[in-house]
C-alpha cells in the first residue's frame, strides 16, 4: 500500500508517495516529475515499483539510492534493465553497490544484483532529475555515504 506523504497542491503539482517495500519494509519514495516521468528513491523491490508506476500512469526516469545497504537498492538493477532509467547514488558507499558482503545482502531473502551508478554524488551537490531539483546533505553514520535529499515540490 502506498501512502501519499504530501497532498496535491492547488496547482496540481505532484505528490511524494511512500511505499514500504521488500522483506524489511524499506521506505521507497516515488515523486512524479516532468512528462509523467518519476524519480524513485531507494527501490527495494522492482515488481512493486513497476506495479505502482503502471497503476499511476508513470514512467521511470531516474533511480536514486541514498546509501549502500541492499534493502535500499535490491530492485534497482532490474528496474534499470526494464526501463532504461538512470541511476544516481551516494559516492562514499560506491564499493557497497557491487559487493553482497559489504551491503548486507547476505541477510536478505533475495538474490544479490550489483548496480553500477551512472552518477555518484557527494554532500552539498545539487542535481536535477525529471525536472525536480535535489540537494544532497551527507548524513554519515548508518553508512559512510548515508545522505538526505532535499527537493521543493512546486516551487
List each model region and its residues:
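Divalent metal-coordination and catalytic microenvironments
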Residues: 31, 42, 67, 121, ...
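Conserved beta-strand hairpin/beta-sheet module of binuclear metal-dependent hydrolase folds
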Residues: 13-56, 148-155
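Short acidic-hydrophobic surface loop/beta-edge motif
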Residues: 8, 19, 31, 125-129
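Active-site HxH/HxHxD metal-binding segment of metal-dependent hydrolases
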Residues: 45-128
Amino acid at each position: 500500500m502506498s501512502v501519499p506523504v504530501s497532498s496535491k497542491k492547488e496547482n496540481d503539482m505532484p505528490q511524494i508517495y511512500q511505499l514500504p517495500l521488500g522483506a524489511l519494509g524499506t521506505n521507497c519514495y516515488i515523486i512524479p516529475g516532468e512528462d509523467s516521468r518519476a524519480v524513485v528513491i531507494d527501490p527495494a523491490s522492482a515488481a512493486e515499483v513497476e506495479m505502482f508506476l503502471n497503476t499511476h500512469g508513470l514512467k521511470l526516469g531516474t533511480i536514486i539510492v541514498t546509501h549502500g545497504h541492499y534493502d535500499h537498492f535490491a530492485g534497482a538493477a532490474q528496474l534499470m534493465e526494464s526501463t532504461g532509467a538512470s541511476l544516481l547514488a551516494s559516492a562514499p558507499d560506491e564499493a557497497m553497490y557491487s559487493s553482497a558482503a559489504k551491503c548486507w545482502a547476505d541477510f536478505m531473502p533475495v538474490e544479490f544484483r550489483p548496480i553500477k551508478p551512472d552518477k555518484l554524488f557527494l554532500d552539498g551537490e545539487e542535481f536535477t532529475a525529471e525536472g525536480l531539483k535535489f540537494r544532497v546533505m551527507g548524513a554519515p553514520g548508518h553508512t559512510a555515504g548515508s545522505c538526505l535529499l532535499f527537493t521543493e515540490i512546486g516551487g
